């Protein structure tokens, strides 16, 4: 069975090989995420080559995501991990050094030091290590640790309650986006989005680089991103609820309600929503997840997430393939119990999708007709992707087979809940409907005598305005006589 909620896997040392990537794909991966906070263009280019070859061989819409480093704060190089204990002090410096307990550790970006006051709470490595700033100077900070831990190279660092006025896009981000455009990557996840203008800045950069239509996912991981969420959600193409940094920048107890709010608003705007961070964290080491992790995945789906994401579990974990299989199993079981009717009551006034009145009216009516007729799939032809994206937000009980002539739309739709993209070069209605039925049978979505609903353009129309309820076999044999 195919999941409707999509699975994003982060690729790293544990999985950057043709053999492991093939196993992840077979286990249920829909999107491969490359984290540009780590690795070089050479290693990422190698992974992109493996992934493109794999998706061509398997003929599947596997999307490749570029996750930017963004204006994040990280430790510098630490050749040997530094063991710290409660009460111990350590200096963070602006100079480029190999970190040690005695000489201190580099902190990047170098311009951050003037923004950090004495007494500020510092959280390192997703909050596992807590320290307080006891001394702040123009080019260094002195920390006192509140607990024990192990400092390692390039780990993230957050300063709670401090708005560090760093530019949204760094020189590295621009170089990485240029690389992503040259490599024809499918989607970009923008880290540390704080304002709606950040999305506009990145979109202009992508246009200057030659790909103005590259979809942008806004990662919400700080208080400013939450405060400006409504505008960000309308301007971005999707939202990622980055719970790791969000739970550090804010309080962890705020995260569940924020997750529900962001998932709901994302659906109302018509954009996909990714829930991320620590979904199967224990499987980095263990072969089985905790019960709490299983419940977390299920609740993210009940909230309306379009996709759920694995990070360290597949990038560096001991059981990457098992983690994807577990996630797929949880998704399939949860989707059996999803309350589809509740999604039909969405407020359309916040929609950011550019859809015509025809599609708005006919799309929702089509879903209701198909459900009453017990149709097994909805087939729609799309050049821009907007029709299946619009339909997806209502979480219909049946799959949406999206037929498209656009390669970029084909891969972009891999992120949409319940959408199964099919690439075609045919614009003739009879031909692409026939192809879609064959595809549905091959994917296990359809059988010969299933009812299906087809959305298409009328002969004299430029917009989707036609509904046809019919039988798969009638399309395949050319003996179609529409039921409605």
Curated annotation (Swiss-Prot):
Its EC number is 2.7.1.40. It is an enzyme of class 2 (transferase). Its cofactor is Mg(2+); K(+). Substrate binds at residues 33, 244-245, 277. It catalyses: pyruvate + ATP = phosphoenolpyruvate + ADP + H(+). Homotetramer. This is Pyruvate kinase. It comes from Chlamydia pneumoniae. The gene is pyk.
């Amino acid at each position: 069975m195919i999941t409707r909620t999509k699975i994003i896997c982060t690729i790293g040392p544990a999985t950057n090989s043709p053999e492991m990537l093939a196993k992840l794909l077979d286990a249920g991966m829909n999107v491969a995420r490359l984290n540009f906070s780590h690795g070089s263009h050479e290693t990422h280019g190698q992974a992109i080559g493996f992934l493109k070859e794999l998706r061509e061989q398997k003929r599947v819409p596997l999307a490749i995501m570029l996750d930017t480093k963004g204006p994040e704060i990280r430790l510098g190089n630490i050749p040997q991990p530094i063991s710290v204990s409660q009460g111990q002090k350590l200096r963070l410096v602006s100079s480029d050094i190999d970190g040690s307990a005695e000489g201190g550790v580099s902190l990047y970006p170098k311009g951050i030091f003037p923004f950090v006051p004495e007494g500020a709470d510092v959280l390192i490595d997703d909050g596992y290590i807590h320290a307080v700033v006891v001394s702040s100077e123009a080019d260094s900070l002195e920390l006192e640790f509140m607990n024990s831990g192990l400092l390692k190279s390039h780990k993230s660092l957050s300063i709670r309650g401090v708005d560090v006025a760093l530019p949204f896009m760094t020189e590295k981000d621009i170089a990485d986006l240029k690389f992503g455009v040259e490599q024809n990557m499918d989607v970009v996840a923008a880290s540390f989005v704080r304002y709606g203008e950040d999305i506009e800045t990145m979109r202009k950069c992508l246009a200057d680089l030659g790909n103005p239509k590259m979809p942008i996912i806004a990662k919400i991981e700080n208080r400013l991103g939450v405060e400006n969420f409504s505008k960000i959600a309308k301007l971005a193409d999707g939202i990622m609820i980055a719970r790791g940094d969000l739970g550090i920048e804010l309080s962890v107890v705020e995260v569940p309600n924020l997750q529900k709010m962001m998932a709901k608003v994302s659906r109302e705007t018509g954009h996909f929503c990714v829930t991320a961070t620590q979904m199967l964290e224990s499987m980095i080491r263990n072969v089985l997840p905790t019960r709490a992790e299983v419940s977390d995945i299920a609740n993210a789906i009940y909230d309306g997430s379009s996709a759920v994401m694995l990070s360290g579990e597949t990038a560096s974990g001991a059981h990457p393939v098992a983690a994807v299989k577990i996630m797929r199993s949880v998704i399939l079981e949860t989707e059996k119990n999803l309350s589809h009717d509740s999604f039909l009551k969405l407020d359309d006034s916040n929609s950011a999708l550019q859809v015509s009145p025809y599609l708005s009216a006919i799309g929702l009516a089509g879903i209701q007709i198909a459900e009453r007729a017990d149709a097994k799939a909805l087939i729609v032809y799309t050049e821009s992707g907007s029709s299946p994206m619009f339909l997806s937000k209502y979480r219909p009980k049946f799959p949406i087979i999206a037929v498209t002539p656009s390669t970029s739309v084909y891969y972009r739709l891999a992120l949409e809940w319940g959408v199964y993209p099919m690439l075609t070069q045919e614009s003739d209605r009879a031909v692409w409907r026939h192809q879609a039925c064959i595809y549905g049978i091959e994917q296990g979505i359809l059988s010969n005598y299933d009812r299906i609903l087809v959305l298409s353009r009328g002969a004299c129309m430029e917009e989707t305005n036609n509904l046809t309820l019919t039988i798969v076999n009638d399309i395949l044999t050319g003996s179609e006589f529409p039921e409605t």
